Each structure stands twice: as structure tokens, then as C-alpha cells.
Swiss-Prot record:
Organism: Xenopus laevis
Keyword terms, alphabetized: Cell membrane, Cytoplasm, Endosome, Golgi apparatus, Lipid transport, Lipid-binding, Membrane, Nucleus, Transport
Superkingdom assignment: Eukaryota
GO biological process: ceramide 1-phosphate transport; ceramide transport; intermembrane lipid transfer; negative regulation of autophagy; negative regulation of interleukin-1 beta production; negative regulation of NLRP3 inflammasome complex assembly
Stated family: Belongs to the GLTP family.
Recorded name of the encoding gene: cptp
Name under which the protein is recorded: Ceramide-1-phosphate transfer protein
Length: 215
């Protein structure tokens, strides 16, 4: 069983995203970021094919990032800041149109970054929801406020239709393998601030370097 097929554990995601942040939250360790994403892929995969339009792309992006981390310039990809500085100074990023660097680390991570925003919003909505909340509505709202802005109409339509098949809130909480509803809510409350910090810092770095709209 591969690392992305193992059972989802919310606690492992918490540990990974907490470990991401270094230097007083002024940088992100990419190995831990990738590990956190592996956990999120397991979360999506545990729901069958509903989130496959995101999880399949995430898996390919994870593999690209792992190849950089394990490659001859792996130290350059140790943190978000070092990756951005290295790729920009070495002209390894397609800034205005796709050309020779479609799989650059900066572009690859940007795609994961956008998807992280959707999952961040959705999981936070789950955390503050009540037993009668419709998960399909929560997920659609989170999607419309994030990933939908980067998808063509046909993908947006297919995504919102697939969300209708999402299970009840209690089923989501069982998938998280934490314990009771109260324990899941507490764990989400502990986890989401770290995910938010990682997202916000990445957004700030990409904004500073004008990388948020990479083709």
C-alpha cells in the first residue's frame, strides 16, 4: 500500500503542517508541506471518486515536488523561500506564458496552494457546522470561494454536481480517525490555524514575487 493509499489521519496532517513552519513562521519546509498534502490526498481518496478531479492532479504535483527534493539541487528546494529565490534567479519559471518550465517548482506548488485554500475553507466549515449541516453545501461554498476561480466552466459544473454525493457530517468525522465528534472538532480547531498560517505565508511570498498568476 503506497503512502497516499493509507488510511487518513487528521493528526498526521496536523503534525506535518505544524512542522512546516520555521524561523518564527517566516518560512515553510517543503518536505513537510508535501507530507501534509499526502495526508490530504488520503482524505480525498477515502471519499471515493468525488474529489478525484483535485486528488489526481495533487498526486502528480506531489510527485514533481518529491523529484525536486530528491534531485541534485534538493537543498535549493528545502524551503519555500529558497525554492523561489533559486528558480527565479536561474530563470526556471515561465512568468508570462508556458514554455520550457511548465513543471517548475513554483508553478507546481502554486497549484497545490490553490487547492489547499479550498480544503482549508471546507474543513473549517465542517468544524463550525452542526449535525444538520449539508456537507455538499459547505463544500460548494468553499469551492466557489477558491478553486472555482481557476477552473473552466465545465470543470466547475462537474465539481458541484459531484459534491451532491458527499456523505453526512458524521461520516466525514469518522473518516478523520480521531474519535468522537467533540474530539474531531477539537483536533480541527488545533489543526486549521497551522494550515492557515502555511497558506497565508505562501500567499504572501508568491504575491511579493508576482507569482500568483503563473500560466
Amino acid at each position: 500500500m503506497s503512502s497516499t493509499e493509507e488510511k487518513f489521519s487528521l493528526k498526521e496532517v496536523l503534525v506535518s503542517f505544524k512542522a512546516c513552519l520555521i524561523d518564527d513562521d517566516k518560512d515553510v519546509i517543503l518536505e513537510h508541506y508535501v507530507n501534509g498534502w499526502k495526508g490530504l490526498v488520503r482524505f480525498m481518496s477515502s471519499l471515493g471518486t468525488i474529489f478525484s478531479f483535485v486528488s489526481k492532479d495533487a498526486v502528480s504535483k506531489i510527485q514533481i515536488m518529491e523529484s525536486y527534493l530528491a534531485g541534485p539541487n534538493g537543498e535549493r528546494y528545502r524551503t519555500l523561500q529558497s525554492m523561489v529565490e533559486y528558480e527565479l534567479s536561474s530563470d526556471l519559471v515561465d512568468l508570462t506564458k508556458r514554455s520550457d518550465h511548465t513543471d517548475s517548482g513554483c508553478r507546481t506548488l502554486l497549484r497545490l496552494h490553490r487547492a489547499l485554500r479550498w480544503l482549508q475553507l471546507f474543513l473549517e466549515k465542517l468544524r463550525v457546522s452542526n449535525e444538520d449541516s449539508k456537507t455538499s453545501t459547505l463544500c460548494t461554498e468553499a469551492y466557489n470561494d477558491s478553486l472555482a476561480n481557476f477552473h473552466p466552466w465545465i470543470v466547475r459544473k462537474a465539481a458541484t454536481v459531484s459534491f451532491i454525493a458527499l456523505p453526512y457530517r458524521n461520516t466525514f468525522f469518522e473518516i478523520m480517525n480521531v474519535g468522537t465528534t467533540e474530539e474531531v472538532v477539537a483536533m480541527l480547531g488545533e489543526s486549521m490555524p497551522y494550515v492557515t498560517k502555511v497558506y497565508d505565508f505562501t500567499q504572501e511570498v508568491y504575491s511579493q514575487h508576482n507569482l500568483l498568476e503563473l500560466p
